[in-house]
Every structure is written in C-alpha cells, then in structure tokens.
Amino acid sequence: MILPNYFQDPNTLHVNTVEHHAYFIPHQQNETALSGKREQSDYFTLLNGQWDFNYFQSYHDLPDNFLDIAFEHKIPVPANWQNHGFDHHHYTNINYPFPFEPPFVPHQNPCGVYHRTLQLTPKHKRYLLNFEGVDSCLFVYVNKQFVGYSQISHNTSEFDVSDYLQAGTNHLTVVVLKWCDGSYLEDQDKFRMSGIFRDVYLLEREQNYLQDFFIQYELDDELRHANLKVETLFSRQPQAIEYQLLNPNGFTVFNQTDTHLNIEVEDIQLWNAEKPQLYTLILHTAEEVIVQKIGFRKVEIKDGILLFNQQPIKFKGVNRHDSDPKTGYAITYAQAHKDLQLMKQHNINAIRTAHYPNAPWFSELCDQYGFYLIGESDVESHGASMLTVKMPEPSILLNHQNDLQTERIRQDMIDNYCYFARDPLFKKAILDRQQANVERDKNRTSIIIWSLGNEAGYGANFEAAAAWIKQRDKSRLVHYESSIYQHSADNNDLSNLDFYSEMYGSTEDIDRYCATAQRKPFVLCEYSHAMGNSNGDAEDYWQAFHRHPQSCGGFVWEWCDHAPYRANGQFGYGGDFGESPHDGNFCMDGLVSPDRIPHSNLLELKNVNRPARAELIDNQIVIHNYLDFTDLADYLTIDYEFVENGVVTSGGNLSVSCKPHSSVILPIELPKNNGHLWLLNLDYRLNTATELLEAEHSLGFEQLNLFSENKLVLPKFTIEKSTFEVQEDHFRINVHNGQFSYQLDKQKGIFSRIEKAGKAIIQQPLDFNIWRAPTDNDRLIREAWQNAGYDKAYTRAYEIQWQQSEQAVEFSVKSAIVSISRGRILTLDIRYRIFNDGQISVEINAIRPTELPYLPRFGLRFWLAKAENTVEYFGYGEQESYVDKHHLANLGIYHTTAKQNHTDYVKPQENGSHYGCEYLKSENLFVSASQPFSFNLSPYTQEELTEKKHYYELQESDYSVLCIDYKMSGIGSNSCGPNLKDQYRLMESEFKIRFDLIFDKTIRQ
C-alpha cells in the first residue's frame, strides 16, 4: 500500500501536526494587526487558487510514483471536488454512505491528489502550513517528502514544514481521501462532499513563537470590574509580552509587560448580542503583533435559569450549516456576512454551528456583530442507530405516535445509537474533536456554550469529553442533546452537562419539564423544522418559551436549504444525482433557499421574535419589551396607523422608554367605536443604523383589533334584477334570465356552468374540494389521507329538490364526498339560493366520520379564465398565511395575481393560501362568507403540485385555479416534529358555512 493505513486506524488521528491551539494570525505592525485582515500580515501567505489535480476512483488506483506523474486537471482551492465534475453529489441524512464496519472504509474510496508550487526564500524561521478544512483526511508532502497526516474535516490541521522547504520553487502535494475512520464520526445530515474546502495558508513564525494563549477573566458581583488573566505558551521557552488593552472606543486601558497577564480592569463595558462591545487586546512579542478582541460577559445558571450578564435570555436561534449551491462547503467572508446580515434582519440572535466548527474567522464575525454561539464539535454518528433496525426512525426515536412503535424497538435503536459513545476504540477520536474545537475557539466571546456534538448517543467517551471541557474552560456551559439517549446497560454521569436539551419536543414537553423545579434549563437545540412550507408552530413555541423562565428558547432547524445546482442549472436534492441511499428532499429544510432568498417561514419567525409586543388592555395599548439589555427608546421607533374598514385614516410615530423585560402604556388615543372594523397597525423600526442594519429597518409589526365585536363593512351592490326561468331534464337543471345562466349537475349536485351575458364565468364545473398538495409537513399524514381516498375524492348527489319564489330559486341538495374503494368522507346537506339579481348563496352543512383522518381543507374550487388572474381581497397578506402561520401578515386590502401568489418550493406543495379573508373580488366574481375564509389563486392545480417532484417540472393549468375554503388545516412542522395540534386541524364532526357569490363584470360599491 502506497499510503500508510492511518485512515483506518482510530489510534492515529494526526501525524506530525502542531498541537491544537487558539486561532490567531501574527502581524509585523500594529496597523495591519488592528485591521483584522489576515491577508495584510507579512507573515501570512494565502495558498488558495487554482491547484493541479488528479482524481482516482480508489486510493488503490494511486500509482507508486504519484508524486512524479503529470496532472490532468485544475481545481480551485478551496472547493469540493463534487462541484467540479469529479465523483457525484450524495445526500443522506442518517444512513452511512458506506458499509458499517468501523474503523474500515471501502476499498473503492475515491482519492484526490492536489499539487501547487510555492516560491520561497526560507529565513531562520518556522513555517507552519495550515489547512482550515479538508474532508475527510489528508496526507501532506513537501518536495516529495512525507510531512504528515491529519483527520477532522471541520477543524484546522497545522504542520510545521520548516525542515522540508528549500530556496526557490517548493512543491506542495496533498492527498485527500473521501472517507476515513473519522467519517464514522462525521455522519451529519448534509450533502456529503470531499476535498480541500477551506483556506490553506503558510505562516512565518519566529523560532521561539507564541504558540497559544488563553484569555480568562472573572467579573465582580456588580459586573463592573474584571480580573483579566492571559496564559501563554511559547514553542520553546517563556518570553515576556507587552500587553495593551483598548476599550471599545479605542482608548488605552492599560499597557503592561510580563510573561503572563493578571490585571484588574475597571468600569468595563459588557458584551451582549444586542450591544456587542468589544475591547482589543494587543500582544507584542519580540517580532510579532497579535490582536485579539475581547468581550466581557458572564454566563451562568441559577435556579435552573440561564443568565447572561445576570439577565435571563432566550435564544432566538437557528442551526447553520456551511452550504452553498455552487461552492458547497467552501464559504467566503462575503457569504457568511450575507447569512449574518439576513439573520440580524430577521431577529435571530443565536447560532448553533451545526454540526461542526465553522471556519475560525466565523466566530470573529459573530463577536463583532452580536450573536450567541453554541460551538459544536465535529461529531455525529447518527447512522449507527440504523445498524440492525430499519424502521421509520424519526417517529420512533422521537417518541412520536406510530403503529410500529414499541419500547423494545426504540431501545434497540438507542443501544445502536450509542455505539461510538461507548466504544473504547473511538474514545481518543471523540476527545480529540472536543479539544480541537475548544482550543481553537477558546478566546471567542460569542461562543458561550460548548456542544459535544450531535446525534451520537451517550456513553463513557462523552462523559470523558464533558469532564475535560469543564476542567479546561470553566467560563462556559456544556451542552449535548444526545445525553437523553443512553444504552440500556449504562447508568451515565450527566453532572458535567448544563442543559436539558431536546430536539423537536412539543410545547407540552416544555410545559411538562418546566412545571417542576429543575436544576438545568430547557433548550430545544432543534425545533420547528423549516422544511418547505413550514414553521406554523413558531408562535406556539414562543408562547411556551415565554411562559417559563427555565426555558431558554431554541434553535430552528435549519438556516438554509441544501441543494447543489444540477447540470440543468436547477437545484437538486437527494436522488437527483443517482446516489443511493438517499433521503430525498429532506435536505430542503431551511428558512432561506439555497441561494439565500427568504422563505415565508423566515418572515413568520421574524415577527414571532419581534423585539416588542403590544396588546389591548382596558382600552389602552400596553407594550412589552422583549429585549434583554436595551430600553425600547434606545432601539426603536414605533410607527402607527389607524385603519377603518381597510382604509388608513390617521397615524404617527413615537418613541417610548420601556426597560428590558418590562411594560408601559403607549400614549395613543384610540378612536370611538362607530361599529366599523378598526385596526391599529404598529411597525417597530430601528432607530440608528448598525453594521448590519440600516436605520428605519422594520424589526417587526403588530396589529390590534380595537373593537373585536365589530366586523368589516362589506361593499354594497346595485345589480339589475330579473326573474329566472327553470328547466329540468334527467341530468341537469338550467336556471336563466336575460343576464345570467346557471346549470346544476344533478349527478354531482354542484354547478357545472355559470354564464353572464353568454360568457362563461367558470370554465369547468365547480368542485367541492378537500385535497391539497401535501406539504413536507404532511409527509407523515399523507399516507393516511391517501388511504382514506382524499386525493381521489369526488361529489355525488342523492336527492335534489327545488322551488321558486319571487326573490329566488332555491335548491336543496343531499350529497356526499366519496372516493374509490372507500366509504363516505363527508355527508353534505346543501342549500343553493339563486337570487333575482344573480347572486348565489351556498349554505353547506357537513358531517364528517370522526374515525377518518382530519381533512386537508374543505371548500369550493373555481376554474376561471386564464386571463382572470388578478384578485383583490381583505385578509392576511401579502405573504401566504394559514390558521397557525399568519403572524408574518396583517389583515388588510391586498391585490395579487395567480403567478405572484405562487411560491416555488423546490419540491412543489401547497402554498399561497390566505387566511382570515372577509371578501375576495376578481373581474367577474365577488365572494364573501358567513365567517372569515381562506382562499388560494394559482396557475397550477393541486394535482399538478402533488404529482411533480421539482418546481421546474410544473405545467401551468389552462385556467386560473381559485380555491375558496371554509378552512385549511394548519402547516405545523411535522416533517420532523410534533403532530399538528388539534386546534389547527379540520377535524370537526360537523360544520356549517355559507358562501355568498356575486357574478358581475363591474362590481359597484
């Protein structure tokens, strides 16, 4: 074998690497060091760019003379080779993409050989070659000499290459394998990509250089003074350092020379995510200048409550992968900056680095911009849970109701889950990954919690890891959700873990845990799974978080959809690249699209997490400040407007002082009750621009119904009246006068034709409609819906009676919604009244067998002319809205078209509904109802959205498809979360609704 077998030996993790240490870049001058730009350092040589490249299907194909052969290709560094025509993309969530035989990996293990030259005139210095991220392992050669080996994809591997360099041209060769034994610990839910995906650079250091330093401090009880300590480690022997501290305004606090630092700092300015005040510590050695930003903060737990600077805080967090449709894992400053800016724009204050450390500069940005970080180690072995059990894992492991669920099956899976957590062979690797994470980022202010990893079970290896972290860093807390999954033979020590953490627990789980005094805070490290049209439960979760001081919030799964570009230029998900096994579109579960376009999910979450909330109490507007450290007057201005029957009548703006976690009354005079619908709209706007946000940026909004008993005053119509004639045959009943013509299908009991002045208003017969294109959150209920025949349902009539009066023709229809091979889905008792002015009243009494699954929706489907694709409505808009997902929208008058109303989720599904509507008006149709209704206008049928797998495969209907719904079931987050709550399901055993339809080309008020 040409390559040493290090890649299948868990006892050989690194060969000739520098020990893990804090990340920093030495400079020659203060000016460049203070710039924060490492490229300006004279001691830093970036080796990114086009490298020579050879690709082999297996490392066995690597020729003996691989260091001498010519290179056939070029590849950018950093990059993933799957994005450049080598190998193929592979998405899997849980299952390993290779046989489970730890520590062995397949012989058909793809291999990439990278090469570049470096011109150098070596000095009497040390030269450190850094790789910030390589998947999965690397062998390093300089001038054809083996330098070393390392594995751990998402952390830095550093080699001292001083003794291998020569004057002039130097040849750097790196062999990267797709898999190694470390891949068993890197089974994260993502596209599996390979190669050198983070920066490569060479550092020039002194012979006796500062190798590591650790900044620590203790704050006094008043959080005003700090005892600041800096421990240092030099490569050879201790050396004196000149320490200089600058305050956030740039003024010198102290200047002191010593080997280690121990000094009191008075009148400190604290760091938090709302006000990220950073000090600057400058370390001057004999030849180098090193700059490290410091934020003074204190994180602790008291009485089961998470405190930050002695204030309880809530994580308004997200889980973030490094992911881009074009660059894969290779993320630049600009890409990360865009993510962080979008997060700030949408009220996100915390990030879990799922499920590995990000690039070392990422947390610097979070220090600067103000985010709380859970710094997670590069450990996940979820696939071990599937070792001997192939079942619907999420529903069992997460304790969701399932017909196949048994405690034995669940415990078998958990025992498998803990494989690597208990295996002594992998103890060294698990501990190494914790040490790499902690040592590299230990001086980062924004990292306030260390996480041992993700979905790897619990056992002795993680006990040792948690104990090591607690001994090494007493200033931060330790998190590990998988501690709740323990092997049946174990009784584990959890004393070094500071949180009770769950994934996708329900609001009832939060209430249950917090109902009794607990020593540990409750955190949902993953919740409200953002797959497709999702996050309908965000408001309910935050109501639960706010109910309980012991609940410290959570981290939505996840920030962005994962989808590389396909050859056709469109996004692809699991299975689109010919891979097996795969998990389909389960990677499309982000708040933003792969190219960072916000989904409605993110807009919902933003407003749920708005910094202030208002409510009407005793005819006064009370505002609550949900900020943790900032007075509202220092942060935002409130724009307000009064809306009467959909029309803005007056408004203004104001600033009000309200301390964190407190409430005040807004000095706004309310209108008198005149029986109309009065709404008060509040818009919270940022006072002053920040590094990421512009002044006047909307931080969220509020809408209050000032007189809840009042209803919208609908338009009044003047339409010519004329007596109808009625004609009946075996199949139909025709009703017509000089203007209107209606045809009732006697077999279905519904209108098959509606015309005005000889022009068809509906292009196909109306439908009673119960189906919707399943959302990703319907993936567990979808089978039950289809088994009940909901997707093939149609209407049949049993009895029709009619009578005519001077005012109207009235039909009484007894019918049902049925399906092939199934019994009745709904029993319908319908009364149609066609009035002499052409208006139709449709009164429906429906009875539903309660043994059937809840309904996706119920309503009428209209097939309008393609050209009739513009509507006005009063309801929740402009964004799509649902019974549980309408906090992103306000009630008001809006206009939309069929195309504008449609959202292209990568996997097509229900979208574009609008909740809480009082009326809808198109060119030839006006709809109102006995209660607020939902509607959807789309260029696509629900059948088309159900059938197609990708948005770019959709074929538009020949019609504009309008659905008017009594109710649409909610959205929830059941793709990987709790079942949809009963109050958001259409599950009544009996319900009534009346729709009023007016068909007129020019509707006049």
Curated annotation (Swiss-Prot):
Active site: E455, E526
GO-annotated biological processes: lactose catabolic process
Pfam family of the protein (one): Glyco_hydro_2_N
SUPFAM superfamilies, per database record: (Trans)glycosidases, beta-Galactosidase/glucuronidase domain, Galactose mutarotase-like, Galactose-binding domain-like
Record carries keyword ATP-binding: no
Keyword 4Fe-4S: no
Alphabetized GO MF terms: beta-galactosidase activity; carbohydrate binding
InterPro entries per the UniProt record, alphabetical: B-gal_small/dom_5, Bact_Beta-galactosidase, Beta-gal/glucu_dom_sf, Gal_mutarotase_sf_dom, Galactose-bd-like_sf, GH-type_carb-bd, Glyco_hydro_2, Glyco_hydro_2_AS
The protein's enzyme class: hydrolase
EC number per UniProt: 3.2.1.23
Protein family membership: Belongs to the glycosyl hydrolase 2 family.
Annotated protein name in UniProt: Beta-galactosidase
Lineage per the UniProt record: Bacteria, Pseudomonadati, Pseudomonadota, Gammaproteobacteria, Pasteurellales
